[in-house]
UniProtKB/Swiss-Prot annotation:
PANTHER family: DEFENSIN-LIKE PROTEIN 1, DEFENSIN-LIKE PROTEIN 7-RELATED. GO terms for cellular component: extracellular region. Belongs to the DEFL family. Residues 1-29 form the signal peptide. Keywords: Antimicrobial, Disulfide bond, Fungicide, Plant defense, Pyrrolidone carboxylic acid, Secreted, Signal. The keyword Ligase does not apply. This is Putative defensin-like protein 9. Disulfide bonds join 34-79, 45-65, 51-73, 55-75. Its main location: secreted. The modification Pyrrolidone carboxylic acid is found at residue 30. It is found in: Secreted. One of its GO terms (biological process) is defense response to fungus.
Amino acid sequence: MKSSMQLISTLFFLVILVVAPGMKMVVEGQPQLCETKSLNYRGLCLKWRSCKRVCISEGFPDGRCKGFFNNKCVCRKPCALLSTEN
């Protein structure tokens, strides 16, 4: 009985590890963030403050370094919700 519970626990943990990275937490009332690669930032993005400064100059409210080996400066803004009302 103990080994079957351990097996079930292990399988559940593995399923969570596989499924969790693809999940997004949606908080009601907060807009989704849209991201685009900065047009003016050059080189590897190592300092998020300099990335943010460049993104602000491009008209975005925020910017962050994104990536692990190949860091890029990514500018972010709240996504516009399209209204379907006429």
